[in-house]
Amino acid sequence: MDKLKRDVKEETSRQPCFLYPLLFQEDLYAIAYDRHFNRSSSFEPMEDSSYNNRFSFITVKRSISRIRQQNGSIIPFVNCDQNQLVGHNRSFYYELVLGGFTAVLEVPFSIRSKHYIEGMNEWTSFRSINSIFPLMEDKIPHSNYLLEIRIPYLIHPEILVRTFRRWIQDAPFLHSLRSVLHEHRNLIISSNLDQLTLIASKEKKRLSLFLWNYYAYECESLLVPLWKRFYHSRSLSYESFIERTPFYRKIEHIDIFSHKYKHLKKSIWFLKDPSIHYMRYRESSIIALRGTYLLVKKWRYHLTNLWQCHFHLWLRPYRIYIDELSKTNNCFYFLGYLLSVKMKTSVVQIRMLDDSFITDLITKEFDPIAPTTLLIGSWAKEKFGDISGRPISRLAWTGLTDNDILDRFDRIWRNIFHYYRGSSKKDGLYRIKYILRLSCAKTLACKHKSTIRVVRERFGSELFTKSFPKERESIFLSFSKIRSQRERIWHSDIIQRNFLVNS
């Protein structure tokens, strides 16, 4: 793989970039073969390993020779008949071709994105999901409006080919890629893993994720430098400018229809600190702005025209929602949380030279809440309970051992507790814990053909202490009490779907 990266780096240093000859290298298909059977990088465990006995590098070598004899075109191999590969599975070798396309595209893309990120040192944190929650907790309370963008989950193949053509000028490779994309249009879907389950092939999932991430990267690579050039510097935190808050409030209450203050309104408006923040996770993007409603509508108009003219993406304005954070009970759904901004009143004693008085200081606070109703609905789909939240037994796991059942419930609860422990209210988490506890007990009772009381008497205190250990929760709770109440501990290490639920 390192040798392939060096070869591609040498090719990309010269213009134009020729990638088509790499499809005829046998090492490329060896890489695709290793990825195909690599359990650590797969989406789900391999259940059928019968391909191991049917794979042969000799057949791949003969297929490459056949491609070279047919005017160097890989398309006949892609569209070949099942009878042309006698004794071998045509779909499996087609998966290797898709793996070859993915490996060729990933290498120059990684080199290109690395150069882009190295030139923007202060934006390196946007690649990490761990930086999203602290950024939202620190910046969103100081914003007035949010732009929620739903990126279309279907992209036309020609749009991707046009974007690839900006940095790949190898016509045969682009024609081959166009043939693959037009033949399988379901490859170009969103990065939502629920929709990716519709794609049965592992290499198709990998290529689909790459195409989606590449397209999102192209959109972001144009927006980030544009905003940096527009604001010239990153916005400062408003916590250090508490004394300027009354000044901003006076600006908002200036009568703009008065001729006396009209010029003053225009001159003072540009003294305000600009604030704009961009976050994306999968197909959802959020732009936090501080300004007026007219400014937010202008941003939506310019973003729509930019994507339509530059990326040929006909993004309608109704796909960009405007949320006003100043309204009460106005929340938005992002990263599995119901997020909102609430007003917090603090009693402050102000001392002067001769006197002191007590006043109220109203501040904005970031308020993340775990969506209990949505979680209960997801549990109902996975057969852990009904739609009303009543636990039921997990019949698919009754064939497992008792330790396996307890370990699976323990893993599910640990992931949920780690991810949603940044929530301001823990009542919903305790309700989910109650559902999982009774579902675990009912699953064991169904396996042993007994009742929940018999299961409790049989396992005793080991039933729930083993599946839901309290030591881990007590450590987290004690550690959170030591820290300030304003700070939260985010455990955002869960970025992949748990496929134990579907087993």
Swiss-Prot record:
Among Pfam families, the record links this protein to: Intron_maturas2, MatK_N
Among InterPro entries, the record links this protein to: Domain_X (IPR024937), Maturase_MatK (IPR002866), Maturase_MatK_N (IPR024942)
- Principal cellular location given in the protein's record: plastid
Query: Where can this protein be found?
Result: Plastid, Chloroplast
* GO biological process per UniProt: mRNA processing; RNA splicing; tRNA processing
Q: Which GO terms describe its molecular function?
A: RNA binding
- Which keywords accompany this UniProt record? Chloroplast, mRNA processing, Plastid, RNA-binding, tRNA processing
Give the UniProt entry's GO cellular component terms: chloroplast
Q: Would you identify the family this protein belongs to, as annotated? A: Belongs to the intron maturase 2 family. MatK subfamily.
PANTHER family attached to this UniProt entry: MATURASE K (PTHR34811:SF1)
Question: What's this chain's function?
Answer: Usually encoded in the trnK tRNA gene intron. Probably assists in splicing its own and other chloroplast group II introns.
The protein depicted here goes by the name Maturase K
